[in-house]
């Protein structure tokens, strides 16, 4: 039995399969894959809206030019390190990037982007996400083999869509899958 072929999923979107992941944080989740190597994987759930925050208060922005709250939605990116915040955003903003995917998306995690968003000088599209999802070596591959996830190319329209509740259903439609007809008995051919 030889080594399995490794397919790097960085920059792809994972779509939780219906009827397999039936509860918890990953139920009907969409995860943007930040990094996927043989050493493990990291991603951000981008359809779990939990609240809205005032950027000025949250990041303790001290600037008298911002007099009103700057409310933005906050998303739960996964069960790991909820104290860490990330902006998943369009690549039109390129200051101090944490990651640049060359597919019109980037990730930042610094005070400067929050100030720029508060001043209206930030990226055209952005999501503020706390926490992330991580897999140990081989774990994601096992989950893919057991059909926990479908994989689709990154689609900015899904990521930045206004209604987070419809993102998962729209991803299934994009993949040509009707949830009602999706069998709970799936396997590999």
From Swiss-Prot:
Q: Which Pfam families match?
A: DUF179 (PF02622)
Domain of life, per UniProt, equals Bacteria
Question: GO cellular component annotations, sorted alphabetically?
Answer: cytosol
Q: Which InterPro entries match?
A: AlgH-like
Q: What HAMAP family does its record include?
A: UPF0301 (MF_00758)
**Per the similarity annotation, which family is this?**
Belongs to the UPF0301 (AlgH) family.
Would you tell me the protein name for this molecule?
UPF0301 protein RAF_ORF0041
């Amino acid at each position: 039995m030889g080594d399995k072929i490794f397919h790097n999923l960085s920059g792809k979107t994972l779509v939780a399969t219906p009827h397999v992941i039936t509860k918890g944080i990953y139920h009907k989740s969409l995860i943007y894959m930040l990094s996927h190597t043989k050493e493990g994987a990291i991603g951000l759930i981008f359809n779990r809206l939990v609240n809205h925050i005032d950027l000025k208060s949250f990041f303790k922005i001290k600037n008298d030019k911002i007099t009103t709250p700057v409310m933005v939605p906050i998303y739960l990116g996964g069960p790991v390190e909820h104290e860490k915040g990330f902006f998943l955003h369009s690549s039109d903003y390129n200051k101090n990037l944490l990651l640049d995917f060359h597919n019109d998306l980037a990730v930042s995690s610094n005070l400067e982007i929050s100030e720029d968003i508060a001043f209206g000088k930030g990226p055209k599209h952005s999501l503020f996400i706390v926490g992330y999802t991580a897999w140990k070596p081989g774990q994601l591959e096992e989950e893919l083999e057991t059909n926990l996830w479908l994989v689709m190319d990154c689609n900015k329209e899904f990521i930045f869509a206004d209604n987070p509740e419809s993102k998962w259903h729209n991803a299934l439609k994009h993949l040509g899958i009707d949830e009602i007809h999706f069998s709970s008995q799936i396997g590999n051919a």
